[in-house]
Curated annotation (Swiss-Prot):
Origin species: Pseudomonas syringae pv. tomato (strain ATCC BAA-871 / DC3000)
GO molecular function: structural constituent of ribosome
Domain of life of the source: Bacteria
GN (gene name): rpmH
Keywords noted in UniProt: Ribonucleoprotein, Ribosomal protein
Protein name according to UniProt: Large ribosomal subunit protein bL34
Keyword S-adenosyl-L-methionine: no
């Protein structure tokens, strides 16, 4: 059985990156929650 986590910087950024978050309404909601919480890093 293979390991499920096969790291890829591009895939990571495209699915969880800042621009990916900004692209949808729910993604923007995620960012605003993280800002409200005071996260140092909003997105990958």
């Amino acid at each position: 059985m293979k390991r499920t986590f096969q790291p890829s910087t591009i895939k990571r950024a495209r699915t969880h990156g800042f621009r990916a978050r900004m692209a949808t309404k729910n993604g923007r909601a995620v960012l605003s929650r993280r800002r409200a919480k005071g996260r140092k890093r909003l997105a990958v």
